[in-house]
């Protein structure tokens, strides 16, 4: 079953809140609502997704739906997702959303107090600081077939790095722990290089 952000059928919602609902709690209803609004159907929006993937050179990618649920013909590679994330980070709105630990919507016709979403990455990350840097943002994913996945980015010693991992198994947050390990080792190597310990 797909994760939901909490919006209900017939609810009037701003597009920006749907975007936060996609990125922070992985709300499938937000993905489908945006696709329907933009293209008239999820299938037509998926065609646009595949067109964009081809333009970006994502040759190891084929999308079948907007939610990321398993389908034998729905696939990508870590490299392709990194290409997509690098491209998306050029958009200021996307960057603001993916860097947000939470987002509160205004009141709607169904939720008079609005809804607050929490980033599935940030809520499981007790500290964003890594050696010589900081994790800036990320998007988690999970299916039984793909395991725990994370597309993230961090700034280390003034340089922005993108890391995409998949297939993490086990309970808890193995994908987030993987990212912490890589970013900390990268930061330590950068420090050692700057201090002349590595030549």
Segments from the language model and where they lie:
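Conserved catalytic neighborhood of penicillin-recognizing serine enzymes
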Residues: 1-32, 113-135
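Structured beta->alpha junctions
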Residues: 11, 23-26, 38, 67, ...
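Short coil/turn segments at secondary-structure junctions
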Residues: 14, 33-36, 65-69
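Alpha-helical scaffold elements that line and support the substrate/ligand-binding pocket
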Residues: 18, 22-39, 45, 49, ...
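Penicillin-recognizing serine hydrolase domain
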Residues: 41-199
């Amino acid at each position: 079953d797909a994760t939901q952000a909490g919006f209900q059928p017939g609810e009037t919602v701003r597009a920006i809140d749907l975007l936060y609902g996609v990125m922070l709690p992985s709300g499938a209803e937000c993905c489908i609502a945006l696709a329907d609004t933009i293209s008239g159907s999820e299938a037509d929006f998926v065609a646009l997704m595949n067109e964009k993937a081809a333009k970006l050179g994502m040759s190891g990618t084929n999308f079948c739906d907007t939610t990321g649920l398993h389908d034998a013909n729905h696939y990508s590679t870590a490299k392709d997702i990194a290409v997509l994330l690098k491209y998306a980070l050029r958009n200021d709105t996307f960057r603001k959303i993916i860097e947000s630990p939470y987002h509160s919507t205004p009141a709607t016709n169904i939720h008079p107090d609005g809804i607050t979403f929490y980033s599935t990455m940030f809520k499981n990350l007790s500290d964003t600081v890594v050696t010589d840097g900081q994790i800036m943002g990320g998007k988690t994913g999970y299916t039984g077939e793909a395991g725990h996945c994370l597309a993230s980015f961090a700034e280390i010693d003034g340089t922005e790095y993108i890391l995409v991992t998949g297939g993490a198994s086990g309970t808890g947050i193995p994908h987030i722990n993987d990212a912490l390990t890589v970013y900390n080792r990268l930061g330590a190597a950068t420090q050692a290089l700057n201090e002349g310990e590595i030549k």
